[in-house]
């Protein structure tokens, strides 16, 4: 993923009243519980699960009830319970593109503010790789139906 002075990004933060470890676990191992599966998918049918393999280089994908899998990206950094970085391999048409030069990055930091208080800071950067459609993709990801809504659902699931 290319970065530079023209980096186009979405920044979101949410405070959750759970431990740092729980926040990390819900974000990574229980994404199915909070992701908008009906609308935020790339397969033909509503998936039954969102899977993130828990290691650097791991796959991040959706799995349909019939076992069909559609890749979304890769785990770039796996540092529980403090940090997760993902390469998002979806293009401007929300289809998988395996070319790493066209991926964007999702950087999530889980900052412990107490034993049962965690600040989750998410940055989805590199959106300029979408060229002429960069602003369109940014607007979608920056909308209430994008990371804001997803993180609100994450916060509910973490409780």
Enumerate the language-model features and the residues they cover:
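Intrinsic-disorder/low-complexity, polar/charged segments enriched in Ser/Thr/Lys/Arg/Asp/Glu/Gln
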Residues: 7-15, 59, 70, 83, ...
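A short, structured loop/turn motif at beta-sheet edges
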Residues: 17-21, 76-84, 109-119, 156-159
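Hydrophobic pocket/interface hotspot
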Residues: 23-27, 60, 75, 86, ...
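Short beta-edge strand/loop motif at the mouth of beta-sheet-based domains
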Residues: 30-72
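Residue-level recognition of conserved beta-strand positions in structured domain cores
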Residues: 64, 88, 122-124
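Beta-strand/loop substructures that line and gate deep hydrophobic ligand-binding cavities in soluble
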Residues: 94-145
């Amino acid at each position: 993923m290319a970065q530079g002075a023209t980096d186009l990004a979405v920044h979101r933060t949410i405070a959750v009243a759970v431990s740092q470890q729980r926040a990390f676990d819900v974000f990574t191992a229980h994404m199915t519980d909070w992701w908008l599966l009906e609308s935020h998918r790339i397969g033909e049918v509503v998936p039954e699960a969102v899977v993130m393999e828990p290691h650097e280089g791991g796959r991040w994908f959706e799995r349909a009830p019939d076992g069909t899998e559609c890749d979304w990206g890769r785990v770039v950094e796996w540092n529980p319970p403090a940090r997760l970085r993902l390469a998002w391999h979806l293009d401007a048409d929300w289809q998988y593109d395996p070319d790493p030069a066209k991926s964007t990055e999702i950087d999530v930091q889980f900052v412990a503010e107490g034993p049962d208080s965690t600040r989750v800071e998410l940055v989805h950067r590199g959106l300029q790789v979408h060229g002429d459609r960069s602003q369109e993709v940014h607007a979608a990801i920056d909308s209430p139906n994008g990371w804001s809504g997803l993180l609100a659902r994450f916060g509910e699931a973490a409780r």
